[in-house]
Amino acid sequence: HTATFNQVVAYEVGRHGFLDQHVKKICQVYKERRDVMLEALEEHMPEGVTWTHPQGGLFLWLRLPEQCDATELFPAAVKNKVAYVPGESFHPNGGGKNTMRLNFSYPTPEKINEGIARLGKMLKEEICANQKIFQGI
């Protein structure tokens, strides 16, 4: 049972249109942060990495070259002070090893750009190392 006070607050927020105002404002904030992330991805991601262009929500998806494993790359990302959610856990029937979910809802635009730059640098280093391994170099 929800507390009566919480019910009254929710009712008043809805009755006075505060929720509509908040949703409009937060949608604009998330759109700005999404756009910052998309621009940073264009600037910093290595060749062979693709990503979604979401029309809503709080996340976008990165797809790495097939030989990459986002779970195996995660410790290198953390070492570079950036984090993501490996996509494999979102694929219940397997697959998704080369995908990652990125969140743009919380970090500031400055932190988004900084984080994507760090992630791009790490991926460039790791993908180059993987390509050498796979090519026998």
Where are these regions (language model features)?
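PLP-dependent class I/II
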Residues: 1-137
